[in-house]
Regions:
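Catalytic core of pol beta-like nucleotidyltransferases
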Residues: 2, 6-8, 17-47, 51-124, ...
Length: 226
């Protein structure tokens, strides 16, 4: 009798687990659909911010939960690869070479390649992002003037973890017709660890030596956490 009751209980448990597994798979599939929709909105310019793209995608699909920025970023990378094809890889390598030229010119300011050119996740409209560390931005502007076209400069302040962070942004066009944004932070911030708001890992980037080695050994390598 006890054995029969246990077999019945076991059957119910297995049925419940199977149903739970189906629900998890359904949720996972739906998260992928929302992430894909949000990534599509970002790629084709319908939205510029991840949060707004996710909210709009969830509303379109009639759901009340959102995927992570990381999930959207992975879908965005897939869309870029599907849409742009082999030319994307060649453009990435060219952008990394252009970045290296600027970084060598600005080597004394501790340049670090960051953003999508570092990650290897560029898409149409991506620019080169380089972080610099110095207390006198005008000095960097003077170094740049002979090699690039400076289109805009501005101071920006953002609040992170309750503290204001100020940086000087320089927008340029390189000799190779690539657009770049140079972010100048204070010298005391050099070496400070920063967390990526999209991928959730540490924003390590590449210095001059690391970028040179990358271009020799694996020029199209991606840096995406697994």
């Amino acid at each position: 009798m006890l054995k029969k009751q246990w077999n019945c209980t076991k059957s119910y448990l297995n049925a419940d687990l199977a149903l739970y597994g189906e629900e998890l798979n359904a949720d996972s599939d739906l998260r992928c659909k929302i992430a894909r929709e949000a990534a599509t909105l970002l790629y084709f310019g319908a939205e510029k911010e991840y949060k707004q793209a996710k909210l709009k995608a969830a509303n379109t699909l009639g759901v009340h939960f959102l995927p992570s920025n990381f999930e959207v970023a992975l879908e965005l990378d897939k869309i870029a690869e599907e849409t742009e094809g082999p030319a994307r890889k060649e453009r990435l390598i060219q952008m990394r070479k252009e970045a290296l030229k600027m970084m060598k010119k600005l080597k004394k300011y501790g340049p670090i390649l960051i953003g999508s050119v570092w990650r290897g996740t560029i898409r149409q409209g991506s620019d080169i992002d380089i972080a610099l560390y110095h207390d006198v931005p005008d000095e960097i502007l003077n170094v740049l003037k002979s090699d690039v076209k400076i289109s805009k400069t501005e101071w920006t302040t953002v609040t992170k973890r309750g503290k204001p962070e100020t940086s000087f942004h320089i927008y340029v066009e390189t000799a190779g017709k690539q657009m770049a944004e140079l972010v100048v932070r204070s010298s005391e911030e050099a070496g400070c660890k920063r967390k990526c708001e999209i991928f959730g890992d540490e924003l390590k980037g590449l210095n001059v030596q690391e970028l040179e080695r990358l271009l020799k050994e694996n020029p199209a390598q991606k840096f995406i956490p697994v």
